Amino acid sequence: MKVRASVRKMCEKCRTIRRKGRVMVICSNSKHKQRQG
């Protein structure tokens, strides 16, 4: 899980979602998991 100020899709399989007011990126590639904040 990467924590970044700006999250963006790293590949076409990445999906941006909101959980508990946080923007997150989920992907089949676990290296692409990101959270904002």
Swiss-Prot record:
- Main location, first listed in the record: plastid
What GO CC annotations are associated with the protein? cyanelle; ribonucleoprotein complex; ribosome
Its name, as the record gives it, is: Large ribosomal subunit protein bL36c
- What's a single GO BP term from this record? translation
What's this protein's family per the entry?
Belongs to the bacterial ribosomal protein bL36 family.
Molecular-function GO term, any one: structural constituent of ribosome
Q: Where does it localize?
A: Plastid, Cyanelle
User: Which Pfam family, an example, fits this chain?
Assistant: Ribosomal_L36
Which InterPro entries does UniProt cross-reference here? Ribosomal_bL36, Ribosomal_bL36_sp
